[in-house]
Amino acid sequence: MAAERYNPRVAEAHWQKVWEENRTFETDNSDSREKYYVLEMFPYPSGRIHMGHVRNYAMGDVVARYKRAKGFNVLHPMGWDAFGMPAENAAMQNKVHPKEWTYQNIATMKRQLKSMGLSLDWSREFATCDVEYYHRQQMLFIDLYEKGLVTRKTSKVNWDPVDNTVLANEQVVDGRGWRSGALVEQRELTQWFFKITDFSEELLAGLDTLDQWPEKVRLMQRNWIGKSEGLQVRFALAAGTAPAGFSEVEVYTTRPDTLFGAAFVAISADHPLAKKLSEGNAALSSFIEECHQQGTSLAALETAEKKGFDTGIKVKHPFDDNWELPVYVANFVLMEYGTGAVFGCPAHDQRDLDFANKYKLKVTPVVLPKGEDAASFSIGETAYTDDGVMINSRFLDGMTPEAAFNEVASRLEKTDLVGRPQAVRKVQFRLRDWGISRQRYWGCPIPMIHCESCGVNPVPRADLPVKLPDDVEFDRPGNPLDRHATWRHVKCPKCGGDARRETDTMDTFVDSSWYYTRFTAPWENEPTNRKAADHWLPVDQYIGGIEHAILHLLYSRFFTRAMKVAGHVGVDEPFKGLFTQGMVVHETYKANGQWVSPADIRIEEIDGKRVATMLDSGAPVEIGSIEKMSKSKKNVVDPDDIIASYGADTARWFVLSDSPPERDVIWTEAGAEGAHRFVQRIWRLVAEAAPALKDVAPKAGTQGEALGVSKAVHKAVKAVGDDIEKLAFNRGVARLYELVNTLSGALQQAADGKADAEMKGALREATEMLVLMTAPMMPHLAEQCLAELGGKVAGKETLVARAPWPVFDPALVVENEIVLPVQINGKKRGDLTIARDADQASIQQAVLELDFVKAALNGGSPKKIIVVPQRIVNVVA
């Protein structure tokens, strides 16, 4: 009898209610089973989830459900990264308080996530804007302050003129603010910093232990930390060219071997010498101001046009007093990196070459590529940056660059310049302390108080939390806390005199740098429960976008170490395994030059071509490129619409099935429809066979078709489990498609009453195993199918969500036959299928019976037959 069509809307709501009522996914910290902590990067509550969220959380849910089935005590929590500028922007635009806007969005997105059927422990939910959360963050801040890991200093900062706030270097992308896209300016402000540089060496060395992270991410962090070993060289200023009080320029270089190729020295716009020279020099002052319009990050420097201002100052070459080099103020040198001064060797650095060509400076090659002639070798438009031998370098000629480095260092370390060595070896790091001050309202208040008499001191712990005031106005840009007199003005905790609160709030990346720790015991009064944190950490599998490779992941690695120093955790690394998933992308569409939504168009096949038109008017629509889903290009698919049309399991199945998880997946309506047809097919096969299988005990087949059914499903159990372990979800999906194809005929026989007892036992086992294997990807369908089969696994009543992962029989997984390629005189002519344990004589005899071998021998005998066991057969005719 034909089964009723599967209704995902009814089934999914039912099973979600069952799981919630049974508290199926709540995790007990006292459970003695082996732990497994899986976590997807928690979302910013922007208003609605998108298909990228669906893919990210579906992947994490597959891992969580699979590990739960494998017997682990799984922690799979969810929360909200809820502070940030969009809430303030919404407050200004829509006249709604950031808190109200944020919590409304959380409610909407929580409903959406719940509709996906994710196996999340919602009892541990928090938002980083919850007072209970940022109270503990303020406690952490004070702990780190007392451990000397927080400092306050004046420095050049990246100022976003649109968002009116400071940005960390990592938040400046191609010279622009990471959120606003505005060109970043430099300003000098007093800021709060976390001393991440105290851990530079540790953070670098720790990357070698993270063998379950993508190498690309580790490389990005290595480059960002940027350890370099070089030489700090003092260049004496030429007599008569320098202002009073200046006698030298100190330069840090990683290439002292190229000193004889030097063409200039460049100093930062903020170098003391540059500042002195700008006094009374309007042209130089103007140039320095122009430099300050750039960001303070290396990325900003790399993208900006390289410019310099010739100061007229000269320095002497360290090895030749008669050789003078011009000193430029340059926009590509930062005071915060090295010494704020560099020497330029145009032949062997592309930036220096571009600069030298622009200002017509001499280009002298000093490293000769292997096989080149020193007399004829020259530099064109591209600097030579590889290895070779030294030339044009006097006493260094003929050395390797490495040997030349050491020779230069050795000589200059022994050379006295005004009572000190002319050079010293130095290790430098590109990493800078993390500036966390933000001039915003919607963030965690920094718990410090400023007193003219006592200085800056922490808020007493008994007075925490420092809560954000609700009665603020967003009628103009800037920080409303600066304008809130009753909140800002307080008494000094030391002297009792008039004082003021710190009005800067913390960078929102602080909030996400320790949330994974809070999930281990979010009910605690202290920031962490040390026992729970040490039990659950590190996170076994962390899943999120590669765009967080530096910012969030590096900060979290620092924060874990800082929390260890403060006694809150006992681990060094926060995330044992890291997986960076690809994006969900979609075609773009335009009508009359305007972006249009996929929901507003119709696509048809006409004469073999896809043609798009507007639904309402029939007007032609241009089908554009496939791009990341974005509201601006209107190529967004709303998960609510997909779930309403097809169900959550279809959405989950599709985003897992179409591409390797690390690559982008292209969302198509046809793909979603195909996934839904598969959902319906599984349901129909199971539901129609269920009456015949409901009361049958599961038992593997031992012969004939029943044995074939059992072999197929046991092989799938092994393979799908291996695929999930490797996060190769698309391969696991493909195997399940294949298994359903294999089982469909036998299940139809059972539905038609044509299966014998052995086949029924094999099918009952196979169907249970199929249901359990699909459960991590399509959990609602799996529960509905098992209910149709009587709600039992191996004879015991259970929810699929609580059932163990099926166990394969090794004997059924091993192939009894093997296919051997057969060559004749070294060329493959065909294959031989034979028992895996066949001896050499049996293989040779079977080969002689093959038609293509008989034809090649033409009635004769072979000279010999070479058998490579389990590999290949070669017939020598």
UniProtKB/Swiss-Prot annotation:
PROSITE patterns: AA_TRNA_LIGASE_I
Name of this chain's protein: Leucine--tRNA ligase
NCBIfam families in the cross-refs: leuS_bact
Catalytic function, reaction form: tRNA(Leu) + L-leucine + ATP = L-leucyl-tRNA(Leu) + AMP + diphosphate
Keywords annotated in UniProt: Aminoacyl-tRNA synthetase, ATP-binding, Cytoplasm, Ligase, Nucleotide-binding, Protein biosynthesis
Family in the record: Belongs to the class-I aminoacyl-tRNA synthetase family.
Motif position, 'KMSKS' region: 628-632
Cellular component terms (Gene Ontology): cytosol
GO biological process: leucyl-tRNA aminoacylation
One Gene Ontology molecular-function label: leucine-tRNA ligase activity
CDD domains named among the record's database cross-references: Anticodon_Ia_Leu_BEm (cd07958), LeuRS_core (cd00812)
Compartments, record wording: Cytoplasm
Catalytic activity, EC: 6.1.1.4
Motif ('HIGH' region): 43-53
Entries under InterPro entries matching the protein: aa-tRNA-synth_I_CS (IPR001412), aa-tRNA-synth_Ia (IPR002300), Leu-tRNA-ligase (IPR002302), Leu_tRNA-synth_edit (IPR025709), M/V/L/I-tRNA-synth_anticd-bd (IPR013155), Methionyl/Leucyl_tRNA_Synth (IPR015413), Rossmann-like_a/b/a_fold (IPR014729), tRNAsynth_Ia_anticodon-bd (IPR009080)
Location, primary (coarse class): cytoplasm
One Pfam family hit: tRNA-synt_1_2
Residues binding ATP: K631
